[in-house]
């Protein structure tokens, strides 16, 4: 790909352009993925891949969390407090990780080739192009997801816009005292506006 001096990450683009321009780019990204990637490669869910996902992705990651030295003590609490708000701890949420329920849920998912890591930081924008359909490209695909559903791409995008992933990665420090976790987390109004726009698009796209 030819280097473009006008290319910037979507995070920077969001915070230096009107919200409507960022929303137009994300609508274009989602539309292009749907038309050029998801639909042409659509296929039924694979029960073996679902089983592999549950074992290698979900259970293995939960085990890593449970066994991590820095998290071991936190695991023992029924509830944890994050920035002054109480949450049920992971061990109290076992129903969310029930294999039988998740097999049924995942079997109904659309499955196709996906990007696999569609966070804000992996979308690059061209500031010298006005047409939103030609003003972006995506980088760093992740093909190791096993159960490849477009919902994973949508979830990664919401990890950014709803979860504030990029802001969280800029947090300088975090304190942990017993079951209390505290850190400074900022979030921009531009992210809030774009989150609502993307949710509207996904509701229309998924029929919700």
What are these regions (language model features)?
Residues 1-2, 157:
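Elongated alpha-helical scaffolds
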Residues 2-9:
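Conserved short submotifs of the Hanks-type protein kinase catalytic core
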Residues 6, 32-40, 160, 164:
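Phosphate/oxyanion-binding loops and surfaces in catalytic or ligand/nucleic-acid-binding neighborhoods
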Residues 10-14, 147-150:
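Active-site-adjacent loop/helix micro-motif of nuclease/hydrolase catalytic cores
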Residues 95-150:
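Active-site acidic catalytic loop and adjacent metal/ATP-binding pocket
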Residues 135-136, 142-208:
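Active-site activation/catalytic loop segments of kinase-like enzymes and analogous catalytic loops
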């Amino acid at each position: 790909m030819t280097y473009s001096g006008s290319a910037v990450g979507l995070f920077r683009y969001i915070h230096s352009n009107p919200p409507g321009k960022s929303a137009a780019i994300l609508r274009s990204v989602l539309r292009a993925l749907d038309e050029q990637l998801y639909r042409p490669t659509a296929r039924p869910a694979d029960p073996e891949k679902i089983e592999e996902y549950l074992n290698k992705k979900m259970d293995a990651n939960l085990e890593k969390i449970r066994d991590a030295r820095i998290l071991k003590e936190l695991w023992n609490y029924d509830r944890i407090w994050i920035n002054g708000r109480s949450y049920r701890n992971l061990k109290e949420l076992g129903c969310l990780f029930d294999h039988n329920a998740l097999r049924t849920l995942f079997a109904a998912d659309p499955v196709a080739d996906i990007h696999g890591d569609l966070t804000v930081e992996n979308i690059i924008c061209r500031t010298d192009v006005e047409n939103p359909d030609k003003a972006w490209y995506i980088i760093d695909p992740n093909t190791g997801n096993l159960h490849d559903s477009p919902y994973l791409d949508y979830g990664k995008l919401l990890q950014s816009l709803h979860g504030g992933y990029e802001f969280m990665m800029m947090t300088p420090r975090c304190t942990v005292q017993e079951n209390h976790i505290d850190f400074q987390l900022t979030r921009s109004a531009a992210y809030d506006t774009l989150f609502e726009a993307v949710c509207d698009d996904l509701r229309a796209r998924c029929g919700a």
